[in-house]
């Protein structure tokens, strides 16, 4: 099995700097969850984290970079879970189970930070696809698809499975159309069902004829 590495891992830093970073990112995440990213200021984050506002600016520079740090923090946890975590999301489960677990977990991850991910994916038309996280997701899905259906175009199908989880479409379905998260996941299951081979079997009707 090809080993995957977590994308965008943090560089080594002093213990006190790392502690301050965790406090700031955690405080920012909580404030954003309550008020939305546009309503959160650096001053508020500093107060909630118990650090000086200068520390926040020195560490992150501006609010946009702080927002991306909140995304990255959650992203590293997600990547670690599907690369190193327990099955079925992590290694050790059959490929069809890992495929389903990954897409469900990615739906949960998108649900948790949909507005922030829309911001991150805005910009150039290919912004989403140039992100290192997308490349890792694509590689992971292509690997699993190659085990589920050897010989298929895994590169194309990996893109096809990731397309419904683009943050802007996901947010439109959840907020505008009012789709429950369970419905989104059921739709993903239907896509997977079209890819997972079904063993040949003989079905008998009540008359005794083989179908």
Where are these regions (language model features)?
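Residue-level detection of the helix-turn-helix DNA-binding "recognition helix"
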Residues: 47, 61-62, 72
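Conserved amphipathic alpha-helical interaction elements at protein-protein interfaces in regulatory
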Residues: 30, 34, 62, 84, ...
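Amphipathic, non-transmembrane alpha-helical scaffold segments
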Residues: 17, 21, 71, 75, ...
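Alpha-helical DNA-contacting segments of helix-turn-helix folds
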Residues: 67-74, 113, 117
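Basic, helix-initiating cap at the start of DNA-binding domains
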Residues: 1-35, 39-48, 65
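Hydrophobic/aromatic-rich alpha-helical bundle segments in the mid-to-C-terminal region
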Residues: 118-122, 127-131, 135-138, 146-191, ...
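Hydrophobic alpha-helical connector segments
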Residues: 69, 82-111, 185
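Short hydrophobic/aromatic patch on the recognition helix
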Residues: 50-60
